[in-house]
């Protein structure tokens, strides 16, 4: 059997966790240095550990941040049952945090012993259920095995056992529970095609979905589209999440993440009217944006053509976004698309643009700006030409006046033709002129 022993969080209910923390946390994603304690408090279980380890592995030369992340990951792992990941973290720490954060063989042996005893107990129970052919008991037995393997960090085995419950589901609620478990493990394994598949399966009966479950499915679908670089689809999913979700899906995603992922994907993929209608005027999504003021302000600045301010917000956010386990691979692509859209939007209203002033607005050199504009012109995204000597961009707007004259002349000719045809018909009827075909002899 395949095993993934990377990580584990505490045993948890994977489908219907209600989110015990109801406090409205303040923004973590901002231009300030990452407050790792506040950031980690947004999550629970395995994703909390994996996010901390991701930060420890990607924080560059910031040893203080790395040590804090490793220390918190160590403490969190010891609340669970994943001894393999514990050993890996201890090796990563390498005696740099003192004896308190060293190898605890007694703990590992005790946890492994309890895990083996629990596994034997679950096997005996499942064998009994299968002998008695009680479908509901068999379903719960496989589900318990899935929970067990998930807690031990064996994600492949957890996934297989959750999927085995499918043959013993007797209600729509059971099927949704199975799908939510499969989605959770698939996200942790990075198998986002599986995520999409089980989201679609859970949504087959939308009238039976509870609002909270529906919100979780939209989050999972948004993450899948994000990982597959389908940014517009990802934005739509995140924008449709009900704000009542709150912290109830923090074994996967925090409300601040929904605002950040949804906002950046929308900026990169929506046109101006969509941005206004689906983001800025979206009352539900506004609740998420309030948790991340920097993202809210950069969206408003972009829409209001305050590009210098927008780009400053983006620059200040970048270092923290690169430490995000889901977003880090997409930051450069999203930023590039947002910048291109800003350049295009800046040039649209003008017949000519002073490249020096435009370069100041975009915090770049004139030569660098020229190269960016050349690429956009070559891709036919901007209809313009560059006067490199005088450093001016001249727009090639269509001649609206000439086009209007041509359209009027065409309409006039068509009207004249129709009137002449009607007059001819009226005269023929007036003089009772009827063309008859010649009779055959």
Swiss-Prot record:
Signal peptide: none annotated. Residues 230-400 form the PCI domain. One of its GO terms (cellular component) is cytoplasm. Keywords: Cytoplasm, Developmental protein, Nucleus, Phytochrome signaling pathway, Signalosome. The lineage of its organism: Eukaryota, Viridiplantae, Streptophyta, Embryophyta, Tracheophyta. Changing residue 222 to R: In fus6-T236; abolishes the interaction with CSN2 and CSN4. This is COP9 signalosome complex subunit 1. It is found in: Cytoplasm; Nucleus. Belongs to the CSN1 family. It comes from Arabidopsis thaliana. InterPro entries: CSN1_C (IPR048624), PCI_dom (IPR000717), Rpn7/CSN1 (IPR019585), Rpn7_N (IPR045135), WH_DNA-bd_sf (IPR036390). Component of the CSN complex, probably composed of CSN1, CSN2, CSN3, CSN4, CSN5 (CSN5A or CSN5B), CSN6 (CSN6A or CSN6B), CSN7 and CSN8. Interacts with itself and (via PCI domain) with CSN7 (via PCI domain). In the CSN complex, it probably interacts directly with CSN2, CSN3, CSN4 and CSN5B. Interacts with the 26S proteasome subunit RPN6. Interacts (via N-terminal domain) with TSA1 (via C-terminal domain). Binds to the translation initiation factors TIF3C1, TIF3E1 and TIF3H1.
